Amino acid sequence: QAIQVARTPSSVGKGVVVVLNGYIDGARDVSKCNTTNVATFDSPLVGHLGIVQDGIAHYYKASTRRHTQDSVFDVSKLSELPRVVIMTCYGGMDDMVPMSVVATNPDGLILTGLGHGTIPQNVRQITQNAKFPTVRASRTGSGMVSAVPQDALANYLVCDTLSPQKARILLMLGLTKTKNLKKLQQFFHEY
């Protein structure tokens, strides 16, 4: 089916897609939702872009986010990307892990928080105003993480609807262009 989708003229300009079990999903929004089921890929927040029927891709919507050829990112001349760490938060988390992560001085940090990306108070105190960009994300698997008043105080960015793993990739790419927090946040709303 993936080959059928790739050769369908209407697929041009759609960006990277995942094709499996008759569904077409945009790479930005798709997630693996089951460890072993063959029907594992889904786009729970925005739904499928289309379907494959009789060997033809039928699109019913398109991503409105920038991607592929429309991207400002060019990694062709880079030998490595900035080091961005993901730290998963949980209730009752002690100070050891966040202090250790901050001490390594990564280029960026993705904080995977509870629910709406909620960060435990002690972790917030340790990571706020770090010398590197810090992005709040959620471990829930779906939904938007939007800014809250405490983010401005802590200099946190938010991942929008990206998973922590995808937020990490976007932050690595963003850091190849700028360290400006406002511009980095703009990338999360554009891509």
What are these regions (language model features)?
Residues 10-15, 20-21, 46, 81-83, ...:
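Short coil/turn connectors at secondary-structure junctions
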Residues 11, 44, 104, 121, ...:
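Conserved active-site and cofactor/substrate-binding residues in soluble primary-metabolism enzymes
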Residues 116-191:
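C-terminal non-catalytic interaction/assembly regions of soluble proteins
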Residues 1-22, 26-30, 158-163, 167, ...:
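Short, glycine-/small-residue-rich phosphate/pyrophosphate-handling segment
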Residues 26-116:
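Accessory alpha-helical/coil subdomains and C-terminal extensions
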Residues 17-21, 88, 112, 137-138:
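Short beta-strand segments
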